[in-house]
Amino acid sequence: MEELLIEDSQRFTIFPIQHPECWNWYKKLESLTWTAQEVDMCKDIDDWEAMPKPQREFYKQILAFFVVADEIVIENLLTNFMREIKVKEVLYFYTMQAAQECVHSEAYSIQVKTLIPDEKEQQRIFSGIEKHPIIRKMAQWVQQWMDPVKNSLGERLVGFAAVEGILFQNHFVAIQFLKEQNIMPGLVSYNEFISRDEGMHCSFACFLISNYLNNIPEEKIIHKILKEAVELVDEFISYAFDKARGSVPGFSKEMLFQYIRYFTDNLCFMLQCKSIYKVENPFPQMTKFFLNEVEKTNFFELRPTQYQNCVKDDAFAFKLFLNDDDF
């Protein structure tokens, strides 16, 4: 049996630490803590309305995916990994990750409510699995590889890394290009926070596979999972570009295809197996962001003294009154 699944019936407390490397991962993740209300999207509303309709349609598809994807990740953590894994330090990491995924899900809901005032259109985005066949297909693929009956723990961890890495990465890239256009500062800030978190989640899955598994999946199985994820991303990107009538400022469909293959080869390296695609990074100017090296934002600078949320809905309206005593 895998070490991660063996319960120590004599251990009731986290201290003394028995797995210091896993504990360090947890503490790093803890240091990234933020909340969905810490980003100001007021300027984004004007930028969004000024954006050409095809470009808006592209980003709506991305939001529709993200709203669904984080909920699936939360479900897997709560119903599978956190019930099965017995190493406390790993459970601490996954507990923190689940909390972060809740923040991400709330953040995407705030983005939709802020940018899209029409309630019917909001509902279409919130119902991504029902309204978008490719999102439903991606969700089914994730659930397939997270099934503990059909897949080993190692296969599920590889699938989890593919979700947190491959399925999310092109969407992070597309949003980050808005920063180069000097628009949508709130959306970009959310993107930087979330992509940094997800990079940590993906890396931790790779760490567990390399350092804790007795039965690491064969390379051909790892490649199968990763290639399936890439094919799904290709299909989603094609769908989103069709909605955008084939044109989005900053990048082409082919560039995103190439980038996700470049990223997947890096994931292969993290999983200690051979690369698959052997392609160059089509976006060398954004390497720092892609490698999840975005600096930790100073929240004392980010938070206004009195935060004003721009969502025109009482259920989503927040005001934070912050002063030095809060810290």
From Swiss-Prot:
Q: Which InterPro entries match?
A: Ferritin-like_SF (IPR009078), RNR-like (IPR012348), RNR_small (IPR033909), RNR_small_AS (IPR030475), RNR_small_fam (IPR000358)
Could you tell me what reaction this enzyme catalyses? a 2'-deoxyribonucleoside 5'-diphosphate + [thioredoxin]-disulfide + H2O = a ribonucleoside 5'-diphosphate + [thioredoxin]-dithiol
Question: Any idea which positions bind Fe cation 1?
Answer: 70, 101, 104
Residues the record marks as active site:
108
What class does this enzyme belong to in the EC scheme?
oxidoreductase
Name the UniProt key words of this record, in alphabetical order.
Deoxyribonucleotide synthesis, DNA replication, Early protein, Iron, Metal-binding, Oxidoreductase, Viral DNA replication
What EC number(s) would the UniProt record show? 1.17.4.1
The induction annotation reads: Expressed in the early phase of the viral replicative cycle.
GO BP terms in the entry: deoxyribonucleotide biosynthetic process; DNA replication; viral DNA genome replication
Asked if the keyword Oxidoreductase belongs to this entry, the reply reads: yes
Q: Which Gene Ontology MF annotations are present?
A: metal ion binding; ribonucleoside-diphosphate reductase activity, thioredoxin disulfide as acceptor
The coenzyme or cofactor needed here is: Fe cation
Q: Which Pfam families match?
A: Ribonuc_red_sm (PF00268)
Positions annotated to bind Fe cation 2:
101, 164, 198, 201
How are cofactors bound according to the entry's free-text note? Binds 2 iron ions per subunit.
**Does the record's keyword annotation contain Metal-binding?**
yes
What family is this protein classified in?
Belongs to the ribonucleoside diphosphate reductase small chain family.
Q: What does this protein do?
A: Ribonucleoside-diphosphate reductase holoenzyme provides the precursors necessary for viral DNA synthesis. Allows virus growth in non-dividing cells. Catalyzes the biosynthesis of deoxyribonucleotides from the corresponding ribonucleotides.
Subunit field text? Heterotetramer composed of a homodimer of the large subunit (R1) and a homodimer of the small subunit (R2). Larger multisubunit protein complex are also active, composed of (R1)n(R2)n.
What is the name of this protein? Answer: Ribonucleoside-diphosphate reductase small chain
Origin organism is: African swine fever virus (isolate Pig/Kenya/KEN-50/1950)
